[in-house]
Amino acid sequence: MGRSLIFSGNMSLRISHLPRSSLPLQNPISGRTVNRTFRYRCTRILSNSFKSTTRLQTKAVLSEVSDQTRYPRIGAKTTGTISPAHLLEVVELAAKTGAEVVMEAVNKPRNITYKGLSDLVTDTDKASEAAILEVVKKNFSDHLILGEEGGIIGDSSSDYLWCIDPLDGTTNFAHGYPSFAVSVGVLYRGNPAAASVVEFVGGPMCWNTRTFSATAGGGALCNGQKIHVSKTDAVERALLITGFGYEHDDAWSTNMELFKEFTDVSRGVRRLGAAAVDMCHVALGIAESYWEYRLKPWDMAAGVLIVEEAGGAVTRMDGGKFSVFDRSVLVSNGVLHPKLLERIAPATENLKSKGIDFSLWFKPEDYHTEL
């Protein structure tokens, strides 16, 4: 099963990304690092190509400067009795194990059932979650687990809560559309402590993956290399992402209006259909912001930490301090956060005035938090 999974080489998907990337070149088929002499020649060619440019406009940059200081941090202050390195090791292993199951199934016919009128679930969701659970239980048998398919499992008195989305973007997966992922995040006393998202890229017959990961206070990585949000400081130059839930209620209608509004004033708004992937794209610097109503803990637990550790900002859509147990999220590169809130927060407050509550809608009973 594992032989079918090719964890992505560190090549950017577009050649225009190469001048601003520090990721090592790898052969996308063998995964082996490209010959150093060849890499040196490529570097010289790229360097010479840009010598005449006095100012190179870039989006994603490697920088430790953060624009998130005005917003409360959401990451855990500590990982408790487990070291950050060990916790991240298991989180990544769990996500990659689930991704192996998905990779095995991605080009095969799928047996699709429905949880509602339009919320489909495949056998792959269930098999991926089972594989992830096996990894978590083997390493931390006393931890509490919240899975999208299996619900609550384990000891509710544990300080650790694993939030598992075994296949984020199931509809995309079912159609072979390249925007889906396996997402695993672990909370310590209610706050994100470690995260891993394995994103599927490519398309039918040429699927590949890249792995995003983060620990609280440890930075964000893509395929082991540090990443950072963009520095775009104007909405007019920003690429934005949102999502729509299955309930066509007032929140859905309000977000449709926000979608139209931001389409008029930004570079564009995308609706890709996988929350974890959307947030990782903000962390990578290829989009500036993502927002959505009606999300659940397993949708957000991994992605929000990766964004924050990449230098971004995370709040509720009304601007309040975010919790994984809330029902709305706005993530951004930090620079644009106040400008986005100027438009989004009033719409959210209007929904709240109608009795729609987006805060702390779901938390496992008896699970201790520091929120």
Swiss-Prot record:
Annotated positions binding Mg(2+) 1: E148, D165, L167
CDD domains tied to this protein: IMPase (cd01639)
GO biological process, one term: inositol biosynthetic process
This protein's pathway: Polyol metabolism; myo-inositol biosynthesis; myo-inositol from D-glucose 6-phosphate: step 2/2
Protein keywords: Acetylation, Chloroplast, Hydrolase, Magnesium, Metal-binding, Plastid, Transit peptide
Tissue expression profile of the protein: Ubiquitous. Expressed in pistil and seed endosperm.
Reactions catalysed, as given in the entry: a myo-inositol phosphate + H2O = myo-inositol + phosphate
N-acetylvaline modification, residue list: V61
EC number: 3.1.3.25
Gene3D superfamilies assigned: 3.40.190.80, Fructose-1,6-Bisphosphatase, subunit A, domain 1
Binding of Mg(2+) 2, residues: D165, D168, D299
Subcellular localization, as worded in the UniProt entry: Plastid, Chloroplast stroma
One MF annotation (Gene Ontology) recorded for this entry: metal ion binding
Plastid as UniProt keyword: yes
Enzyme class label: hydrolase
Positions contributing to substrate binding: E148, L167, D168, G169, T170, G273, A274, A275, E292, D299
Transit peptide: 1-60
Family listed: Belongs to the inositol monophosphatase superfamily.
Function: Phosphatase acting preferentially on D-myoinositol 1-phosphate (D-Ins 1-P).
PANTHER family: INOSITOL MONOPHOSPHATASE, PHOSPHATASE IMPL1, CHLOROPLASTIC
Protein name, as recorded: Phosphatase IMPL1, chloroplastic
